[in-house]
Amino acid sequence: VGAYAAEQICRAGIGHMTIVDADTVNESNINRQLPALHSTLGMPTAEVVARRLLDINPRLKLGVLNEFLRDERTEEVLSATRYDFVVDAIDSLSPKVFLLYHAYQRNIPVVSSMGAGAKMDPSQVRIADISKTCNCALAKAVRKRLRGLGVNKGIPVVFSTEIANPDA
């Protein structure tokens, strides 16, 4: 999700962007991730995406963080630059919640992608407040953690109302 979002934002003509990803491209990513090609196997995902974005827009001011955002590091990153918007495509619960919480606390608009595993029907994809999600285990877990931090609503998310297919 993150690479697709970054590419579309880049193509729309954004001037400044920061991308964060500590993963490396591996073969199991080829069926679903934009930077995953046989020629990029084993390469850092953030670097592959960065090259692609700069090839699209060489004037893009691009920050590249080849790391996983952890608690205090998230605070550092959000404090170091004035961000107009955050696109969250993190698939790990704690870093996702921490990013959403700190963006919310700083009044940085955000949109967050929730889980899509074992879901096949694109007609059931919705955008709604985190408080209005259903049939998404990741959204439920994020909602619970955010409530524990005092955030009950105010974070838009992309999720699917489809019930996950256990055979998928």
Residue ranges and their predicted role:
Residues 1-168:
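Adenine nucleotide-associated cytosolic modules
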